[in-house]
Amino acid sequence: MSTNQASLPIASQEDVVIVRQAVRKAGVEAGFTLVDQTKIITAASELARNAFIHGGGGTVLIERMEEGARKGLRLTFTDQGPGIPDIEKALKDGYTSGNGLGLGLGGAKRLSNEFSIWSEPAKGTRVTITRWKS
């Protein structure tokens, strides 16, 4: 498997926009359809906002991947925030620890082909999503 990668900070609302733009560019370079671009950009936007708002900021690692003929993007969002006490509950639509609609984590999971999450109270959260080219 070969990868191309870039790491970006998420410390402001402007950084969330920069993450969206970087993911869009990576999706275009990977040959994603407009639908696949929209899905991965939307998921990235939700996860970047979560890292900024709930995690106090963090980073995203954007990896363009190739496995044989398959091409995809893997995004890993990491923060050192308060963590998520109940991941199963947090993945349900409507759950929010803030003022949002509570669609971020569950929505990101639905928009991805692969999804993993690790979180520990007082240690932070790491969410990794992968979207493969259709």
Name the predicted role of every residue range.
Residues 57, 113-121:
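Glycine-rich ATP-binding loops of the HATPase_c
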Residues 1-42:
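Bergerat-fold GHKL ATPase/HATPase_c domain
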Residues 97-112:
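Glycine-rich phosphate-binding loop
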Residues 61-63, 78, 118, 130:
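Solvent-exposed beta-strand sheet faces enriched in polar/charged residues
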Residues 67-101:
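Glycine-rich/acidic phosphate-handling loop/turn and adjacent ATP-lid/helix
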Residues 34-60:
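Conserved ATP-binding N-box helix of the HATPase_c
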Residues 54-68, 72:
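G2-box/ATP-lid motif of Bergerat-fold
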